[in-house]
Structure formats: C-alpha cells, structure tokens
Amino acid sequence: MSSILPFTPPVVKRLLGWKKSAGGSGGAGGGEQNGQEEKWCEKAVKSLVKKLKKTGRLDELEKAITTQNCNTKCVTIPSTCSEIWGLSTPNTIDQWDTTGLYSFSEQTRSLDGRLQVSHRKGLPHVIYCRLWRWPDLHSHHELKAIENCEYAFNLKKDEVCVNPYHYQRVETPVLPPVLVPRHTEILTELPPLDDYTHSIPENTNFPAGIEPQSNYIPETPPPGYISEDGETSDQQLNQSMDTGSPAELSPTTLSPVNHSLDLQPVTYSEPAFWCSIAYYELNQRVGETFHASQPSLTVDGFTDPSNSERFCLGLLSNVNRNATVEMTRRHIGRGVRLYYIGGEVFAECLSDSAIFVQSPNCNQRYGWHPATVCKIPPGCNLKIFNNQEFAALLAQSVNQGFEAVYQLTRMCTIRMSFVKGWGAEYRRQTVTSTPCWIELHLNGPLQWLDKVLTQMGSPSVRCSSMS
C-alpha cells in the first residue's frame, strides 16, 4: 500500500494550517526529515478527524484550535482497547524513534493507552498538544489538565480529551531565596562528608510500601507506582496533600528571621546544563562527562554519536573491560530516559532490564535510609529529585550551621546502575562493584549550595573530591 495520501479533505487542511512549527531543519538531511514530519502530521490529523466525525466532536476541535479558547468543550477519543482500531497490538518494539516515541510496524492503539500513527506511538493528548501548541513537548510529565476538563488524561476514564487547549505546560516553580547569615568564624577544615560509595546500602523495590514523610512537600503526582504512561489520580493527590502541611515547609518559614544577624538572600538560578553525567565501569571512570542542556535525554547502550539529547555508552572504549562488563553493556539497550520538568527530575527505565537508583532526595521523601538503592523495573519511572523539597531542606539546614548545609552536597548526586543491582540483598554490595553505572551531578542545586556556603563563610581548605 502506498504511503502517499491520495486526498486531503478540506477540514484536515484547515487544521494543519494551525500546526505549530518547531523551527530549524537540523542541518543536513533536514529537508527530507521535515517532509516526513509533514506527512506524519497529516496522517495524525486525518486519523483524528475520522474518529471525531463519528462522534460529532470535530466542530468543537476546530473551534478550540481556531479560537485558542480553553473554555471549549472536551474533545474525546477512546482511551483504551486496541480493538477499536480493528488491529492487534504488536508486542515488540521494532525501533526507537528519535522523537522519543516508540516505533511499531503497523498502525494500532496499544493496551497501555498510547496511540499509534504511522510508525510512531505516543499518548494521544501529547501528540496533539505537540502538533497544535508545543512542538518541543517531550513527555506527559510536562502537561497538566485545566480544572474544567472532564476527560483529562490523568482521570483515567474510558475516553481521553485531546483538546490541546484543555492542557497547560507545567511551569517551573520559582524558589524563594534562602536567607543566609554572614558568619564571622572561619572553619579551619571541611566537615567530613557522608560517603555511601563503600557502605552497604539497603534495597527496596518500586513499588513498595511507600508513604511520604509528613514533613516534606507532597509529590505531584504523589508517590506511588508510576507505569510507563501513568499518573496517579487527583483523589490520591488530595489524600497525599492531607498527610502534610506545605505551608509549614516553605523555605521562608523554615528560616526564621533573626534581626540581630546580617541576613543576605541567596537566590536559585538555572544553569546552562542542568546536570552532568559520568559513566563508570566498576571503579573506573570511562569517557568524558556528558553535560545535559535539554529537559529530556536518554542514556543508552547504543553506538550512535551522542548529541544534546542522547548519551550513547556503546561508543566508549576501555582497555580494562572484562567479560562481565561486556555482557552487561549488551543488555543496557535503550537504557534510561531522564526528564527535568518543573523543577523535578524523573528517571524512566526504557531497558528490558531493571535499573537501580540511589537518590538521597528520593529516599528522604519516602523515609528510607539515605543510601537505599531502589529498583526501577522496565517501563516504570520514578521521581528522583525535587527542587522544592531541596529548597526547604536547604533553608532548614542554614539554621543548623555550615556543616549541615555542606552535607546536602550528597543529596545533589544520584547514582544509577544498569542491569545489575547493588546493596545488602545483592552479591555486589557497593556501586563500584557493579559493571556499568552512571553518576549524575545536579548542577543547579550544587551551585546554589556553593553560593550559600560562600555567604556563610568559606573554609580555608578548598573542597576536593577526596574531602
């Protein structure tokens, strides 16, 4: 069957006229890629129009797009059951598409709620929000429904609203400055920093008996098992909100003003690269540090040259690599996708094998030991850092002195191993015993810590990796 569309209905042409352009061809081959993108967009719109004609909601979609009005009605399509497309759901993934959407060999609707259009697979509300509002949209984590949307994606109803004006982009919250007293005493040496590298951490599986600690700001979405495309319901969010009191946790209230001190506000600012990633094999650093500038990136085991959205470990060589490391590298596959959205960092396991994460910020949220290693199964994701939680901790630690603030440095470092886990329940008990692992440094929080420590009074001994 030819892939060329024989006829484009006028309504499809009108709707395509409102499509948002991503801008830029991306260099050589951009023309061909743009041509393929245009064809895909036309198929996506044509497919949607066909479904909406049967339900009489097509006029409402056109009204929403042309008026750009959020007060329009819901425009819904069935949210589950591949049978509605008259096609079976493929159970294998043929190819990873560079747009971040799964790629299959035929058009269908899968059981996980994702929509298949011409070799690309994604959540329907994300597809059409990208098409008509935000071409740079990467994930459903970046979207939240407006209050009057009755069929929002997160409500998990039989139908899902694809009205692009019923969704908003998640905004990064503005973190209030931390009020820091200027201390006159200068420390002669740095306090010892908790180091979990050589300790034997506890282990936990995700999901587990997770209950957020009441003295921390609730997650959005709240803690719980998050499937490949899942979010918890608003009811669960309200229950989570009842367990704590965010008003009591704001950095301003955690830093009581003492007018006898010389208090200076220290503000948070976003760096050009939100995180830096180093790759290790056992206890040996391999390759150069990857600096992440994009809100979404993958760390995988393939061999394509790395770009701003992809860190390929398959290209990296190591003369000391043994057979165990070689075998593990072959199983990294699609690896892990990292999102930095709205001041929150998520890790999604794309590999066929689990990933293992040690995130002190995440562990503190759930009341685990700071060194706990959490297993993330394939197709699941976990929030591994939250800027607002960190801001509250920082403001609280300022009142406890230089050492308490300095200890937060460890919270800005996240370790993650591929395929093989480590900890008390595993043969490998330290991260440096795992064949393949990465270490993330969150640059924004680290730079904020540096400014706060400088304001508090820098010690005379310089910080180093050995301190």
UniProtKB/Swiss-Prot annotation:
Residues 207-217, 233-243 have a biased composition (Polar residues). Residues 10-176 form the MH1 domain. Pfam families: MH1, MH2. Changing D300V: In a colorectal cancer sample; somatic mutation. Residues 274-467 form the MH2 domain. Keywords: Acetylation, Cytoplasm, Disease variant, DNA-binding, Heterotaxy, Metal-binding, Nucleus, Phosphoprotein, Transcription, Transcription regulation, Ubl conjugation, Zinc. The modification N6-acetyllysine is found at K19. One of its GO terms (molecular function) is RNA polymerase II cis-regulatory region sequence-specific DNA binding. This is Mothers against decapentaplegic homolog 2. It comes from Homo sapiens (Human). The lineage of its organism: Eukaryota, Metazoa, Chordata, Craniata, Vertebrata.
